[in-house]
Curated annotation (Swiss-Prot):
The lineage of its organism: Archaea, Thermoproteota, Thermoprotei, Thermoproteales, Thermoproteaceae. Keywords: ATP-binding, Cytoplasm, Ligase, Magnesium, Metal-binding, Nucleotide-binding, Purine biosynthesis. The keyword Nucleotide-binding applies. It is an enzyme of class 6 (ligase). Coiled coil: none annotated. Monomer. Part of the FGAM synthase complex composed of 1 PurL, 1 PurQ and 2 PurS subunits. GO terms for molecular function: ATP binding; magnesium ion binding; phosphoribosylformylglycinamidine synthase activity. Belongs to the FGAMS family. The keyword Zinc-finger does not apply. NCBIfam families: FGAM_synth_II (TIGR01736), PRK01213.1 (NF002290). This is Phosphoribosylformylglycinamidine synthase subunit PurL. Mg(2+) 1 binds at E78. The gene is purL. InterPro entries: PRibForGlyAmidine_synth_PurL (IPR010074), PurL_linker (IPR041609), PurM-like_C_dom (IPR010918), PurM-like_C_sf (IPR036676), PurM-like_N (IPR016188), PurM-like_N_sf (IPR036921). Pathway: Purine metabolism; IMP biosynthesis via de novo pathway; 5-amino-1-(5-phospho-D-ribosyl)imidazole from N(2)-formyl-N(1)-(5-phospho-D-ribosyl)glycinamide: step 1/2.
Length: 693
């Protein structure tokens, strides 16, 4: 039971009686935090979501962003944290399947996946078991349905050893004429298609709305079926002309799908639960109602279009059931073998109470006095950190070329670049970022950092940012410090979106991410999507022998929350880097003017990590004088490792900013004037920076 005494009383008042078992199942599922956003939806309206190019914003299964007249891109982010903690393979695989189906709801063809993953330290046996299972689940599902995994990020921290944060983003494309037209009316049919209902994932939404304990709840984890998922993708590409609306049958099962659709269209809905095709004949009506069996969609169509759909169901060998009909009157009615087993007002079901929790601010540990360590050892330690390391051990498990759209592949640049085959050379640029240490130290500034980092990655790759989606992952909102984190994170996201002119068109909040009474560091992930007019001119994080190396932006004494501070001193302290939105917008202008083909931003791990990444990517060394970098600090370790925002590197004959070095030879040399600070062969760097799982 996920309902409180106050909620049960509200249900009794709304019904004028006690709920039946089926009605109780409905409210338990649909009023869960996972489905109803009880603790968060009142605050999320603060996020700006409108722009002339936003056709459809938050509130339904997937948004729509116009990238050219008559052509839309959709993208959405989803978390599958609790399931991945207890069954990493299926938890991650079903997370990917669910986000793909969200994209299908607007009739789009899924063209790419990105994953933002947060695990415990890779040397920990349990964390490694989770990481390996999650990566395998994502790989198997994405490869089998033919949707490439083109990018993302992976973060390692002790907080995620038993409570991983597993985020998947799917991108799709659809022409305006292929978006289901809506206009649902009384008499229209409610059809369930896909896998047969079973008990896998039963109570999954309630499970995701409570804190994890040592007692694993494997029964609440759904089981993936990528072959059925692929059939649904193919079905939708033809069926979109025969339907009025498509909805994913995911969290909350039929309970949530029925309540949301009836509410959105201002209608009632009558469903015969026993008519749903099942793979478990022992299920009762309440179980059928809240089953979260994967690979299922709801299609809404008129009686006259049913023959069109039936032919497609047969063509793609997709099971289906016509189980309900929309009605006048505003009631949700559920039947089982002819008997009414549930009858509730739509508005009661659709409007869970809004919760507002108390908040309690905290102050993070101030930055201690830091002695300067031996720089060569410090550089090696930061570059070999699993957070800075090259993630080939993960992305090489993924098929990132399927679909022939991927232009800039994982590891090659700051963001994924995909060709829109429908528009010739026009494409999209997409990147997701998060830094849990930043959002722990300052939730507001940390959230803003995630936004500007993703924004800058897209810009440096030559994209023009259009829209963003976010994912906020926290502990229990009943903890005043955690709810304060949420409130502050929303403010940080709102400030960044408003200042940069990039609307937030969707998102996800996941709460109760705790283990044994310990909440995680907050994870606020932001995925920014941009447009590029010619994918052949996208920038990659590389250089060639003879290139000048140019740095634009000012390095400040900003090592609060940095990888350097944690790896060398074991500290999580200080303030995250400041954000200057005018500087970030100036980078957009500069990139548009200079049009670099070889570039990277400076972020995690500082200038040392950015230079090492470009050397490893290109196989060419460099000679760099870090003391030529524009800076507000003279400490050499801060010049190397500060994570100040508003900086990027370009390589070529000329570039914006200050020339700090030249690409040459087979070694990376970092110096200050005539003093050599660090020297390593590129092949040694490649080995040093290789993540091992």
């Amino acid at each position: 039971m996920a309902l409180t005494a106050a909620e049960l009383e509200a249900i009794r008042r709304g019904l004028g009686r006690g709920p039946t078992p089926v009605e109780l199942a409905l409210f338990t599922a649909h009023w869960s935090e996972h489905c109803a956003y009880k603790s968060t939806r009142g605050r999320l309206s603060r996020l700006p979501s409108k722009a002339p190019w936003v056709v459809k914003g938050p509130g339904t299964d997937a948004p729509l962003v116009e990238v050219a007249p008559g052509l839309y891109v959709t993208f959405k982010i989803e978390s599958h944290n609790h399931p991945s903690a207890v069954d990493p393979y299926n938890g991650a695989a079903t997370g990917v399947g669910g986000i793909i189906r969200d994209i299908l709801t607007v009739g789009a063809k899924p063209i790419a996946l990105l994953v933002n993953l947060h695990f415990g330290p890779p040397q920990d046996a349990h964390a490694k078991w989770i990481a390996q299972g999650v990566v395998r689940g994502i790989s198997d599902y994405g490869n089998r349905v033919g949707v490439p995994v083109v990018g993302g990020e992976t973060w390692f921290d002790e907080d995620f050893t038993y409570t991983p944060i597993v985020l998947a983003t799917c991108v799709g494309v659809v022409s305006a004429e292929d978006v289901p037209r809506g206009g649902v009316e009384a008499g229209d049919l409610f059809i369930v298609v896909g896998s047969g209902a079973d008990k896998s994932g039963l109570g999954g939404s309630a499970f995701a709305s409570k804190t994890l304990t040592e007692e694993e709840d494997l029964g609440a984890v759904q089981v993936a079926d990528p072959l059925m998922g692929k059939r649904l993708i193919d079905l939708v590409q033809e069926a979109r002309q025969c339907v009025k609306y498509i909805k994913d049958l995911g969290g909350g099962g039929l309970a949530t799908a029925a309540a949301e659709l009836a509410h959105w269209f201002g209608l009632g809905l009558e469903i015969d639960l026993d008519k749903i095709h099942m793979s478990d004949a022992e299920m009762g009506p309440a179980e059928v109602l809240i089953s979260e069996t994967q690979e299922r969609l709801v299609l809404v169509t008129s009686e006259g279009q049913l023959p069109c759909l039936k032919a497609l169901f047969e063509k793609y060998d997709v099971p289906y059931s016509v189980v309900g009909r929309f009605t006048e009157g505003g009631r949700l009615v559920f039947k089982w073998r002819g008997e009414v087993v549930g009858d509730v007002p739509v508005e009661l079901a659709a409007n869970a109470p809004v919760l507002e929790w108390p908040t309690r601010p905290y102050k993070a540990k101030p930055l201690p006095d830091l002695p300067q360590p031996p720089l060569d050892k410090a550089i090696d330690a930061v570059l070999s950190s699993p957070n800075v390391a090259k993630k080939a051990a993960i992305y090489e498990r993924f098929d990132f070329d399927v679909g022939v759209r991927t232009v800039v592949k994982p590891g090659e640049g700051d963001a994924a670049v995909l060709k829109l085959l429908e528009l010739g050379d026009v494409g999209i640029v997409v990147k997701g970022d998060a830094n849990p240490r930043y959002t722990y130290l300052s939730p507001r500034l940390g959230a803003a950092n995630a936004f500007v980092k993703a924004y800058r990655n897209v810009v440096v790759a030559r994209g023009i940012p259009l829209a963003a989606v976010d994912s906020i992952n926290l502990g229990s909102p009943a903890r005043p410090e955690v709810y304060w984190q949420f409130v502050e994170a929303v403010e940080g996201l709102a400030e960044a979106a408003e200042a940069l002119g990039v609307p937030i068109v969707g998102g996800k909040v996941s709460l109760y991410n705790e283990y044994l009474d310990k909440p995680i560091k907050p994870v606020v992930a932001v995925v920014v999507l941009g447009k590029i007019d010619d994918v052949g001119k996208a920038a990659k994080a590389t250089w060639e022998a003879g290139d000048g190396i140019y740095l634009w932006g000012v390095t400040k004494a900003e090592v609060g929350g940095s990888e350097y501070l944690y790896r060398i001193f074991g500290e999580v302290a200080g303030e995250p880097p400041a954000v200057d939105y005018a500087v970030e917008k100036e980078i957009l202008r500069l990139v548009g003017t200079w049009r670099p083909r070889k570039a990277t931003d400076v972020g995690l791990g500082g200038l040392a990590a950015a230079l090492a990444k470009m050397a490893v990517n290109s196989g060419v060394g460099a000679d760099v004088d870090i003391c030529k970098a524009p800076a507000e600090t003279t400490r050499l370790d801060f010049l190397l490792f500060s994570e100040s925002n508003g900086r990027f590197i370009t390589a070529g004959e000329e570039g914006p900013g200050v020339k700090i070095g030249e690409a040459e030879g087979e070694k990376l040399r970092l110096r200050c004037g005539g003093t050599l600070l660090y020297k390593r062969k590129v092949e040694e760097l490649r080995e040093l920076m290789a993540l091992r799982l």
